[in-house]
């Protein structure tokens, strides 16, 4: 709890919205402004050799300010933890949107791709190379503008942008040929290749170079040969050819990409890559409000803000600025005022009772991408699903940011160990400049925050308990043995253990040999992790604030791209159908109401994939759907697995 003392002075923590290999992302409320943020929480001991990667990401984000880059607000470091407070991106991963549409039209692709080019061109102008460009590292904000996240693998060459890098990193399916060969390379040229892969994925819905065998995939990338679908236009084919040149010297440069004919079609002007959010001029209204609040004169406050320490003052100023940009009053609240539905009381009670958050059972509430309506508080003792209520925070049509959400990212799938060896990084201050375009998606297909229910552990593949039948039962939670060498942060209990685990990532990291370098847990805590304990305490102490019952059946959600509609009208029938299919696909799961928390494991017990499937009632008469959400694991493996599961269901 001591590590959280400073953080809890300024933020109220809500549910977990993303998980990754070494981080967890929580939704939180900034107390003074009432603005929602995403807080990336990392344990230094768990990070091990990944610690330099986090330092790299922090330094990069302190120097980058752009309308298409996820904004860093605040950095807190304690003896054991690092907290990064980041912009809250409710729109979810670009990857999820692509697979929901199968592929994007050329016009839609152009809108999206211009934003990607804008962000990457700005990154390059500041002397950085991102080196991990992929759809999972691009999130949508509440206005459906793209935000680039995850700068843990970025590099800032020591000399200039023409300095050749040596480190082999990134995801194989998006990595440039010169990078995977181990040659020295220019970061900007490698990024252009990755952007070419992105462009192909946007217009085609699948990877240009793909194979289950890593060596076969390596050879395909080195040959540079890929299928050209018949629906691609001649101009888009030409651009792909120019970006996916195996020889980096023949590859199109970023300068020429900005005003490429395909890029400019329907726009008639080049991509505006300059920053529209420079730090050069402070906003008068925000400075005045902070001066009044802190009882300082304007000049003193301007001087303090201009230090850009990324402390609470920086966070408050930037969040006030964000409020103003959305047309909200530039006003700070009393520090004693509680945000949203969750109060600071739980944390006070913890201290007064000498509880340790390590000793509280986790609520396991993971934020679901694409949430429009969601319930902030849930009842863990309920066996049904709560009917969500509309929240004032309708921002996130998903993610995390990535967590690692991605997302912050929602959700955050990262490649460990060797990706971090960024010897090329050096610190230099950033300059400012300006850019951008807006994009409204068609009516999405949607999920909602998942509610908490008592775990119903399945002990045989054929005995399932639907929430409606379980209402009058006393459920006995059966402990499940977990492999000793399993390394997941959240150990998933399961009763249906498959003899065969076959999920392997296509996008294996280039330094896969080092994947086990991250220190293993010395032993699972009896009642769950510290962060998960926060969820539980908030749940227990705010239960009275619930609206509606958790026993009313599946939640009613708005249509969203993360929801698959079915022909069935009975939610219990659909739930049983899914549960009968999962063991056949070698997927272990835990049932909580109408939500199934699923995972796959390797032959050695290592968790390779975590995702959720929730049966929901759409806001139309007699329409039942399945909400899908990836929590951890390779995005393309997840896509294939979930498609296989859903196609096998008789729905």
From Swiss-Prot:
Tissues where the protein occurs = Expressed in placenta, kidney, thymus, testis, ovary and intestine.
Q: What class of enzyme is it?
A: transferase
Beyond the main fields, what else does the record say?
Answer: Potential therapeutic target for treatment of somatic tumors, such as brain and breast cancers, down-regulation of MELK inhibiting tumorigenesis.
Q: What name does UniProt use for this protein? A: Maternal embryonic leucine zipper kinase
The text of the family note is: Belongs to the protein kinase superfamily. CAMK Ser/Thr protein kinase family. SNF1 subfamily.
* GO cellular component terms listed in the entry, alphabetical order: cell cortex; membrane; plasma membrane
SMART domains, alphabetically? S_TKc
Organism whose genome encodes this protein: Homo sapiens (Human)
Give the binding site residues for ATP.
Answer: 17-25, 40
